[in-house]
Amino acid sequence: MGVKYLSKFGSEKNRILTGYVGEKIIMDYLGIKKDSDDYDFDLISKKGKRLEIKTISCKFKPKNDYFCTVNSHDLNGVHKQDADYYIFLRILNNYSSGWILGWITCDEFFKKGKFVNKGTDFGPFSFIKANATILPISSLNQFT
């Protein structure tokens, strides 16, 4: 595995697998045949839009007031990937079930989302590794 391959999802094997499972779910759901696997986006839609798929594992079905998170590796602010849309998913730790939470334009995500500095204790979880922008699942658009 090259550096780009590992840096895309982080170096943890489970995160890499979870990320690719999420991409495959969206490819099947939207009828996309090829994974782009670019640093800034994962897939290209049939309409030519760049899609960044954000998938995390979980222990149970997420609630609408839970957050979707986009981490930033820019230590001084927000690093925005060069994509048109974010699509968020959650997958059970044992991979038995998953949920497509919704989609949002990248610009809208950062306008509506709340920026959280690295090291911030945010209630039930902390942002230890990176700055992040968060947005409640309920703020996402649903696929129809």
Could you say what each language-model-derived stretch is?
Residues 1-49, 54-144:
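Nucleic-acid endonuclease domains
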